[in-house]
């Protein structure tokens, strides 16, 4: 199979997130593994054998969760091309979390005649949907709340959601420490992925009569300043699948752990960066499912109206952080079937 892989933004631009998973009302939920609709696409793949497709993979920024998703997308595109007897050429683009660059990438991808676009994360998806304007299938990956991000009820647009069950993560927090008095909510107010989870966290805490303190930042420097304001004011911190905060996750986790504060987050990439715990989806499964959706759309000529909510159910704990905080996490084994232990990844 022929494959085109460019680990640059693009030559023209090189210079210039049931148990843990949420449920979105406008999406559809199914198992985390397997093809989006391979059984329906089987007859289409037979008739499409020998066809060639070009797919643009547009990653919002570099961090471990998005990197894992991209790698899984590429692996599944390779696998589907071999299985279906087709050629899939794909090219990577990276917007460096910059809307201007992402818009430029969108313009280039459309003008270059790609057959489909797979944007990873909210800002990338929004920019690609605008650029495609309904003319090219856009199959997004890892959007926590597609409705809030303005990615529903649009022609030729679908994808996967890693929607959080914020209440469950709050339950985890209080299962470990029932005496928590104040919770810090650390997020970027420019990140669509954070809007619904933060609102849900506030509602949960208000119902329990627990105080909360908000801290926000839209750049790495702002995030580090924001977290420093929490260290003497809160007992635990929650961050959703926020790509901006993830960009500084290692420094945030270190600051909070040094202050004796447990850090709960919306993705396992935070935990491998030093946060204490999360509960969410498997991002390799999410990437594979997204790739299947894109290939099935190309083979069938039809883009599903509903997005797909990935199943969660996996608690991930950083054992080094647990030891540093002197926390036992035995309570988690009563909450889910699968508790994964990790350590902090080397930078």
Name every feature range the model reports, one short phrase each.
Residues 19-39:
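Bacterial lipoprotein signal-peptidase II cleavage site
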Residues 48-75, 80, 91-100, 190, ...:
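Extracytoplasmic "Venus flytrap"
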Residues 49, 146-152, 158-182, 281-302:
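Hydrophobic alpha-helical segments within soluble ligand-binding/sensing domains
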Residues 55, 73, 162-205, 306-323:
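An alpha-beta-alpha
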Residues 56-58, 109-122, 139, 183-185, ...:
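Periplasmic-binding protein-like
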Residues 87-111, 216-230:
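Structural motif
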Residues 127, 131-166, 265-277:
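Flexible loop/hinge segments that line or gate small-molecule binding clefts
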Residues 296-347:
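Hinge/cleft segment of the Venus flytrap/periplasmic-binding protein
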């Amino acid at each position: 199979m022929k494959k085109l892989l460019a680990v640059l933004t693009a030559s023209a631009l090189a210079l210039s997130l049931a148990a843990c998973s949420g449920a979105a009302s406008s999406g559809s939920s199914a198992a985390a593994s397997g093809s989006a609709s391979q059984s329906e696409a089987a007859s289409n793949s037979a008739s499409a054998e020998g066809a060639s497709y070009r797919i643009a993979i547009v990653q919002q920024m570099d961090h471990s969760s998005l990197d894992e998703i991209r790698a899984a997308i590429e692996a599944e595109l390779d696998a589907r091309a071999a299985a279906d007897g087709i050629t899939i050429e794909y090219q990577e683009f990276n917007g460096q979390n910059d809307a201007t660059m992402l818009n430029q990438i969108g313009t280039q991808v459309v003008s270059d005649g790609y057959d489909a676009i797979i944007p990873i994360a909210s800002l990338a998806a929004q920019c690609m949907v605008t650029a495609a304007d309904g003319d090219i299938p856009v199959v997004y990956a890892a959007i926590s709340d597609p409705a809030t991000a303005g990615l529903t009820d649009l022609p030729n647009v679908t994808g996967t959601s890693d929607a959080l069950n914020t209440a469950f993560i709050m339950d985890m927090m209080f299962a470990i420490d029932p005496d928590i008095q104040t919770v810090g909510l650390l997020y970027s107010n420019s990140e669509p992925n954070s809007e619904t989870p933060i609102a849900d966290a506030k509602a949960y805490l208000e119902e329990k009569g627990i105080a909360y303190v908000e801290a926000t930042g839209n750049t790495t420097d702002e995030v580090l300043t924001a977290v420093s304001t929490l260290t003497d004011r809160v007992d635990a911190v929650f961050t959703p699948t926020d790509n901006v905060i993830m960009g500084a996750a290692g420094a945030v986790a270190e600051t909070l752990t040094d202050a004796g504060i447990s850090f709960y987050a919306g993705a396992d990439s935070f935990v491998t960066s030093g946060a204490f715990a999360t509960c969410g989806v498997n991002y390799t499964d999410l990437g594979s499912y997204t790739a299947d959706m894109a290939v099935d759309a190309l083979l069938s000529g039809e883009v599903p109206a509903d997005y797909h909510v990935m199943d969660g159910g996996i608690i991930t704990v950083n054992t080094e952080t647990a030891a540093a905080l002197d926390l036992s996490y035995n309570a988690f084994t009563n909450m889910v079937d699968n508790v994964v232990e990790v350590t902090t990844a080397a930078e």
